[in-house]
Amino acid sequence: MIIREQALAHLMKYNKEPFHIEHALTLEGCMRYFAETEGYADEADFWALCGLLHDIDFEIYPEQHCQKAPELLAEIDAPEALVHAVCAHGYGICSDVEPTHPMEKYLFAADELTGIVWAAAKMRPSKSVQDMELKSLKKKFKDKKFAAGCSRDVIAVGAERLGISLDELMEKTLASMRACEESVRTEFTAICGNGGENA
């Protein structure tokens, strides 16, 4: 099994944009939270790695997203389950690999939603998710011009695949981001410096 330090170094080999690094760290934290709260605590490290590496190919191969990932992940001998999860998060958009495991379904569902949450958080006086309530997130979600690059349809399909309501997915994602926000911010600043704070 690849270790976290190796995975982070590999992520940074192919991703230089602060936004992409922040997003990867965020998904890592969220996926660890989901594992620990959904009955998969013994797999938390693996779920987190899938979150960290899910967009490994996006920055340098945006037109071949999820297609180049297996090639890049092979460089660190990533296990097949990790490769499958990374490819499955783009199901129906840039991949025909279907998310089947609960971990893959959470990754698929939370990927786009975390983008909306972070965009909303950065507009708040606190610049934080700690004081963000569900009703505030729902308002931003309904405004399709806000964080327009984050697909509401994909998020809705993600909730459906998990067998939960959209509100429940939002609540779980908010909780996961509250749990990891401080650690993500600390590591992101260490990697990118304060200059990447508002990227």
Short names for language-model regions:
Residues M12, E36, A74, K142, ...:
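Short polybasic/polar patches that bind polyanions
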Residues S136-A199:
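A structured, mid-to-C-terminal "fold-capping" secondary-structure block
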Residues I2, E22-T26, Q64, A81, ...:
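Conserved active-site and cofactor/substrate-binding residues in soluble primary-metabolism enzymes
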Residues M31-F34, A69, M177:
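Hydrophobic alpha-helical packing residues
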Residues M1-Y61:
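Acidic/His-rich, divalent-metal-binding segments that scaffold phosphate/diphosphate chemistry
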Residues Y40-F146, A156:
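Divalent metal-dependent catalytic cores for phosphoryl transfer on phosphate-bearing substrates
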